[in-house]
Design a protein with these regions (language model features):
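Active-site helix/loop of acyl-thioester processing domains in fatty-acid/polyketide metabolism
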Residues: 110-128
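N-terminal accessory segment detector
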Residues: 1-111, 132-135, 139, 152
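Coil-to-beta-strand transition motifs
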Residues: 130, 141-145
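C-terminal edge-of-domain segments
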Residues: 145-152
Length: 152
């Protein structure tokens, strides 16, 4: 039995996009940037897969050095890149199914702190310690890619 028609799914998807856009704008306007960033980062942490963190942790525990860990993790996660001494997660498109259909300019780039939390959860879970993640580029704010620098 079909639970929803295609048009109902499209309508629900558009409604969710409007809801998220309104939520982010409301958070930013009413609780401020710092709190909004913390909330979104926590949401991203919850979106991270426990099995992927475990896989990354296993790679780290078997690696003889940070470089070996990053090289091996990069083989299983193609978005991980090293540029000199810097480590990045780079996405050529927005993979967040909650917002990637929202037209450019309708959603604040502050939303991408959700992805920042996802990246932090991955590396903190693997390394067993805090890391800092800096959002350098964001498709939502008009950049051609999303780029997160991981400070290990």
């Amino acid at each position: 039995m079909l639970l929803a028609t295609v048009s109902e799914v499209v309508w629900m998807s558009k409604r969710m996009e409007r809801w998220i856009t309104c939520l982010i704008a409301g958070l930013d306007a009413n609780v401020g940037e710092e709190t909004t960033i913390k909330v979104l980062e926590q949401c991203g942490r919850q979106c991270q897969s426990e099995s992927f963190v475990k896989k990354a942790r296993d790679i780290y525990q078997r690696a003889k050095s940070m470089d070996e860990f990053l090289d091996k993790l990069g083989k299983v996660y193609k978005h991980l890149h090293k540029e000199g001494d810097n480590v990045y997660i780079v996405y050529p498109k927005c993979y967040c199914s909650f917002v990637n259909k929202i037209p450019l300019g309708q959603l604040s780039a502050i939303y991408c702190n959700c992805s920042r939390g996802w990246v932090k959860a991955l590396f903190e879970g693997a390394l067993g310690r805090s890391v800092e993640v800096v959002m350098e580029e964001s498709i939502v704010k008009g950049d051609y890619q999303c780029k997160f620098r991981i400070i290990l």
